[in-house]
Design a protein with these regions (language model features):
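Metallo-beta-lactamase
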Residues: 128, 133-213
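Active-site HxH/HxHxD metal-binding segment of metal-dependent hydrolases
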Residues: 31, 45, 52-125, 204-211
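Active-site environment of divalent metal-dependent phosphoester hydrolases
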Residues: 30, 53-55, 74-80, 99-102, ...
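Active-site-proximal loop/helix segment associated with metal-binding centers of metalloenzymes
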Residues: 2-6, 15, 24-36, 40-42, ...
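Hydrophobic residues in well-ordered beta-strands that form the structural core
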Residues: 48, 93-96, 148-149, 190
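Conserved S/T- and glycine-rich ATP-binding loop of Class I adenylate-forming
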Residues: 37, 72, 129
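Conserved catalytic scaffold of divalent metal-dependent phosphoesterases
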Residues: 39, 97, 107, 114-122, ...
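Conserved beta-strand hairpin/beta-sheet module of binuclear metal-dependent hydrolase folds
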Residues: 11-64, 138-150
Length: 213
């Protein structure tokens, strides 16, 4: 994988404290964020959204001690590297509601709402966030401000709900009831683009409802 290793940025580190490091790469034509959450006490890690460019992701996994893959939802731009990850031996988890979207690429385990996923000494708690897809899910790293929201919440509003099985009212309720109760300092790490915070987005909910997207 020498040539692939050269394609990795000089640093993939995105956020760090004494317990956890978050690494980020941007892949594919839709510029998807792929995150690796790593426990600094044990070296264990999990990858969020095996989107694309599987060779690069496999190199990243080898470097960082990734043990499994978590999918925030089943849209094609978020699952393009899933077959290669599974072939390499990584378990891929997705919610049961979005599992049919992975019928062609496969999956290994269901992620339930409020499930605690242990990554070394870290605990990631799943938060079911329907709206963008029926089974979209976010992940909060307990004891940290980190909240991975997939395509549910972005800087400036909710994810796209123009798909056949998406629903704007549902995503608004999902964000308001399940994400906005987090503290204002919570860092939102979305599936595309830059980070934001709950405090930056929460005051604009009524604007989003009024505009309808």
């Amino acid at each position: 994988m020498g040539a692939i290793a050269e394609q990795l940025p000089s640093t993939t580190l995105h956020w760090v404290n004494s317990d956890v490091a978050v690494h980020r790469v941007v892949v594919g034509p839709w510029e998807n964020n792929v995150f690796v959450v790593r426990c600094l006490r044990t070296g264990d890690a999990v990858l969020i959204d095996a989107a694309n460019e599987h060779e690069l992701l496999l190199e990243l996994c080898q470097r960082l001690g990734v043990r499994r893959v978590l999918e925030t939802h089943g849209h094609p731009d978020h699952i393009g590297a899933v077959p290669a990850m599974r072939e390499a031996g990584f378990e891929v988890g997705v919610t049961s509601a979005d599992a049919p979207k992975l019928a062609q690429v496969g999956y290994d385990a269901f992620i339930d709402d409020a499930e605690v996923i242990e990554v070394g000494r870290l605990r990631l708690r799943s938060i079911l966030n329907p709206g963008h897809t029926p089974g979209s899910v976010s992940f909060h790293v307990e004891g940290t401000p980190l909240l991975f929201t997939g395509d549910t919440l972005f800087p400036g509003g909710p994810g796209n709900t123009s798909f056949a099985d998406a629903d704007f009212d549902t995503i608004i309720t999902s964000i308001d009831d399940r994400l906005f109760p987090f503290p204002a300092t919570t860092i939102v790490l979305p599936g595309h683009g830059v980070d934001t915070t709950i405090g930056a987005e929460r005051p604009h909910l009524a604007e989003w409802v009024a505009r309808g997207w």
